[in-house]
Amino acid sequence: MAAQDAAVQSAGPAVDPVRDTGHDSVRDREIDGEQRHLDQVYRRLEEKIHEAEFLMHDAAKRGQVGTPGALAERDAQVFRAGIHLNRLNNEFEDFLFGRIDLLPGKDGQKGPDGAYTSVEPADDAIRSDRTADIAETLHIGRIGVLDSDYSPLVIDWRAPAAAPFYRSTPVDPGRVVRRRVIRSKGRRVLGVEDDLMRPELTASLGGAALPVIGDGALMAALGQARSHTMRDIVSSIQAEQDLVIRAPAASVTEVSGGPGTGKTAVALHRAAYLLYQDRRRYAGGILVVSPTPLLVAYTEGVLPSLGEEGQVAIRAVGSLVDGAEATAYDEPAVARVKGSARMLKVLRKAARGALEGASATASAPRGARTAATRAARSARGAEVQAGQLAFGEPAESGEVTAPGMLPAPADASSAPGEDVLPYAARSGRGGAPVRLRVVAFGRRLELEADELRRIRESVLGGTAPVNLLRPRARRLLLDALWSKSGAAGRHTDPELTAELRSSFDEDVTSEDSFIEFLETWWPELTPRGVLAAMADERRLGRWSRRILNQGETRRLARSLKRLGADGKGPLSVHDVALLDELETLLGTPARPRKRRELDPLDQLTGLEELMPQREESQRERAERLAAERTEYAHVIVDEAQDLTPMQWRMVGRRGRHATWTVVGDAAQSSWSDPDEAAEARDEALGTRPRRRFTLTVNYRNPAEIAELAARVLALAMPGMESPRAVRSTGVEPRFSVVRDGDLAETVRAEARRLLDRVDGTVGVVVAMGRREQAARWLAGLGERVVALGSLEAKGLEYDATVVVSPAEIADESPAGLRVLYVALTRATQQLTVVSTARDEPDPEGVPDLLRD
């Protein structure tokens, strides 16, 4: 804490006689010096780009044919050169952003991250008269650049040698005398801001006094206008943040911190740092999980700006499952049910119940079956001849069954005198196979409904995924038919019996009728199909008995109706977690790999024999593995406090063997049962050892806004301390009351007012149910203003914010006060609170929830 206080204090002016006090000549001279260095860096970058282009062209010119080994070597060289060229060609804003001026150091001392780097000054570095000479100057940038003699022109910000740029404070300066942040755009240096780490020294550089420009880099960075995308903080990382970014990756790193402490930025910079430190170890990919698509869009440009892209996947929780994208919103009561760990038991029953439904009806009393069959036949007005298999016909036109569920035929008939009950599927009348009839060894063999039901129950008695049990079901069907054939007793010789059995199995399983029966009796279920089946309240009631109450069951079934009978309707973020669980419970049968198609012309001409088969290139393999990847080497969870128990299970599957970084703040949690979520988180993380960090300084909000938000925090979580704001602007939050009931005009007027007062963005935060309304209120005000729901504001920041009706936001859910706390902490400069009668504002417009 002392070091952090010192870092904050260092943002103000240091005592130094050579500090620039407004003389442009000193500032211009320093900017010119940095410009010369930047020009040298870009000249070297151009040389490296030409080298990479030459390597690519040279490799490409090495014939298109050759041995598989030679072709693989060529592909690997092109792949590596292409990656290098892509990194070099990126025109990063602020490519070179920092510099540190260092005293002579002690040799051979282990420094940050285990590297042998001089971190402490030599004993004779500071003379008795408190003067010293600068021995070394390092420039810090997004990627490292060496000159032709392999001397560093730019140090990669992730390198151990760059650590003092972030960790040095006046209390613990190490070798650093001056830390400089360089602001540039493209190839032009715009300005410099210095922090003096040893103000008591008189330091010299090249025989001249060391100049210090500006009033501190941190304050300059905090005062910049915001856009709708997140900028990296690589030039303004503070000491406590740097400790997290460079923490060893073994096991689990947990990071807590209130609003504005830089948790999201730290998580993204940590991903870039880990790849730099051990790229081979993290070749399996790094997954960054964000709570909302808005936050993904806001942050996705950070990693490319840090020189990393390709091996890091940033995904919203609602898009973690292939082919699924959350676009719908669940009401809080429904979300509490879907996110609860209780849903695991419901889904387990649904996965099996979706398959067992057919046998339940098939085993009904014979009289009931007869009556139902006659009624169905009467309705159809026709009879159908029985084939080898007794099972229903396709559903009538207009009746649709859920994909992956049992077919829903409208009628079925058997041989004369035999009754078959049509099975009523969820979306209409229907039937499932109730009798298997085959001809083998000259005999007609039959398995009746009760026998089929017993076989199904026997197979489902295990715990394996339902779709993976199908081979066992097939085996038991064949066993039952073999037993009925009487062929087992024909021979006493076991070898002859085994040969006869093999022939029997081959004959039966090659028949289209048996294949068709198995496809219908034990179909491959799909997660969407089972989820759609759960929209039937009666069926869901059976599967959720003693797990959910009637009200919860009714609300859950009603919310799932939006999926439609085909299961292809819109999903919520909570539905996606249920789909992922069902994928595990159902399983996916192995699919045969698609064989390479052969060109008949190659065979005729003999080229097929002469040409080596082309192996998959390294680039193609990398792209394929990235697309197929479901597990990662490292998982970073942002805003972890918002994950539900079911979402923790989904994320946990993607990091079974991974190391983890978990970032969150309990005070901002929107989940109503934190204890249940904590239990699910512990299960996902397993028994791995944990290292914990806490970020304590609020770099986003001015003190005036932070103090107002702290009042809500005291109501939401008594005893919880809010982070300490690093600055004050003197601008108090504004309170506005809706007049004459015109909420839309009041909000629009306040948004317009803020647009005139800030250079960057304005966010208007409303209750989730008002999102579409709010967007209409702001129509025509321009791109700098955006409307968002209270749950969508997490992790975002704006120059100014309008929070509409605190009471309405707080009443949305049991976690409403915590959600309101988040909404109040989005602004970097100005905050306006709009109150309605529901907020009970006092004469000054302050709503009840925000009063002392």
For the regions a language model picked out, list residue spans one by one.
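Conserved helicase NTPase catalytic core signature
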Residues: 376-380, 385, 395-397, 430-634, ...
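Extended, charged low-complexity regulatory segments
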Residues: 1-243, 607-608, 851-852
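Conserved P-loop NTPase-based nucleic-acid remodeling module centered on helicase motor cores
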Residues: 92, 108, 113-163, 310-368, ...
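P-loop NTPase Walker
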Residues: 2-16, 20, 24, 28-33, ...
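Short acidic (Asp/Glu) and glycine-rich catalytic loops that position anionic groups and cofactors
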Residues: 213-214, 320-330, 453-457, 493-498, ...
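Conserved helicase motor core of SF1/SF2 NTP-dependent helicases
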Residues: 284, 293-321, 325-338, 583-590, ...
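Conserved AAA+ ATPase small/helical "lid" subdomain
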Residues: 341, 345-462, 751
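Hydrophobic alpha-helical scaffolding
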Residues: 223, 285, 289, 330-340, ...
